[in-house]
Every structure is written in structure tokens, then in C-alpha cells.
Amino acid sequence: MSVRALFPKGKEPRYAFEVLIRMLPEAVLNFSSDGISLKALDPTKTALLDLTFYATALEDYSIDEETKVGIIFTTIKDVIKRIGATEKLELEVDKERNRFSFYIYPKKGREVGLVRRFSFPIVQVLEEEIPELAVSFDASFEIDSAVLDDILAMVDEVSDWIQITVSPDKVLFRGVGEGGKAAETELSYDSESVFNISAGEAASAKYSVEMLRDISGKMKSLSKRVKVELSANKPIRLTYEFTSGVFTATIAPRVD
């Protein structure tokens, strides 16, 4: 055995992986002494996804050597759905047998209930070298994750794109569709749903509603808040922190 990782909350890897399943065909999981990480571009080169589980935040983590595991997400899609919110997930990598396995069992441990084991061959996946993005952000805010998802769902009713404008004292979300249909929400500095607004001057850009919803629909179950960073007509960065790690998505803007 090369790696063993025990997640105390199975819902955390489940929802994070469900985002990856929606946005990526395949990727490489990297196991090191610091923990588990994944960094990949979506097929359209529009979104950069970065997921980390910290070794110190896992219930148990052992590693013989740094290990890379190629995963085709369609092969694990149905298994991931089987992880209950209160169940534990144990991930095991056996390099000698060239397999990785998921063990799903009750919160109280293997000894007290049914243990479900799913095993898969490790596949060779091309790991694209991704340089650090030289992106600076002129504006940022934090928002209740469920509120952001509700806003995106509202805008999705009328448009494929959402314009986000951050001013020193408020955040405006707006979508305009065919026939002049529009949806708009404004959250001011004293709103109970938005926090820590930071902007020297107004910054605005448009982004794909579908892509943002693919992320927010799952990650709202892991993080109460999401940090949003953007600049005028530049990429947006969403950062979700949760008990065992952090998920970051950087998404290119719409260019009119």
C-alpha cells in the first residue's frame, strides 16, 4: 500500500469531486506529505480548478512516497454519489497492484456497520503543466454560499451570462436575456449576506452562469461563505474553505 487517507466527513470529498466530475473528463490526484491536491484546466481552457485536502485535517493519513493517480471521472461518478453525508470515506492507493480503492462506512467506524469497497485501475492521464496565473484582483467580497447560488439560479432564468459589479459599498448581480428580460440583485454593505467588500473603485465583468452554478450548486453544502475576487473584464476567483481543505476556481470572463 502506498497511500491511505481517511476523511472524517465523506460529504467533503463527495461534493468537491462532484464539481470536478461536471467540469473535467479526467485529472491527476497528487499525494504528498502535505496532503492531496489536484490542479487542472477544463477542456475549454476557461476554468482553472484547484483542490487541496490538508494531511493535518484528515482523520488518518499515511504515505510511503509521493504518488500520482490518474482518474477518469466517469468511472467514479456513480460511486461518489453513494457517499452519505454522515459517512466516512477511506481512500487507498496500491501502487504494486496499480489500483486505488474507496471504502465507505458509517461514522462510528468499520466495525459497526456495512463496509462498501470499490476498486479501480490506476490509469495514465496526461498531467498538463499549469503555470501560476499572473492575475491581480482589484475588488473582492465574501458572500453566503447559498445566497450566491440562489442569485445565479435567478439570473439563469433569463440569461446565460451574469454581470458582477463590485463597488466600495455594494455588489450588483445582473443578467439580461432575449427580449429585454432582466434579473438583478443588489447587496449593500449592511446586508446580512455579503461581507468584507473591498474595492477602490467599481470593477465589473461578465461570466458564464452555467459554469458558476456547476461550482456553487455543490460547494454551498461545504462552505457557508465563498470569497469572490475579480477585476474589470478579467477572471473571477471563487474560494471555498471547508474543514479538510480548500477549493478554488478561476474562471475567464466573457469577452463581448
Swiss-Prot record:
CDD domains on file: PCNA
Keywords: DNA replication, DNA-binding
Function according to Swiss-Prot or TrEMBL: Sliding clamp subunit that acts as a moving platform for DNA processing. Responsible for tethering the catalytic subunit of DNA polymerase and other proteins to DNA during high-speed replication.
HAMAP family: DNApol_clamp_arch
Annotated protein name in UniProt: DNA polymerase sliding clamp 2
Xref: InterPro entries: DNA_clamp_sf, Pr_cel_nuc_antig, Pr_cel_nuc_antig_C, Pr_cel_nuc_antig_N
Source organism per UniProt: Pyrobaculum aerophilum (strain ATCC 51768 / DSM 7523 / JCM 9630 / CIP 104966 / NBRC 100827 / IM2)
Keyword DNA-binding: yes
NCBIfam families (UniProt xref): PRK01115.1-4 (NF002221)
Subunit-level organization: Homotrimer. The subunits circularize to form a toroid; DNA passes through its center. Replication factor C (RFC) is required to load the toroid on the DNA.
Similarity comment text for this entry: Belongs to the PCNA family.
Gene Ontology biological-process annotations: leading strand elongation; regulation of DNA replication
This protein's record includes keyword Flavoprotein: no
Molecular function GO labels: DNA binding; DNA polymerase processivity factor activity
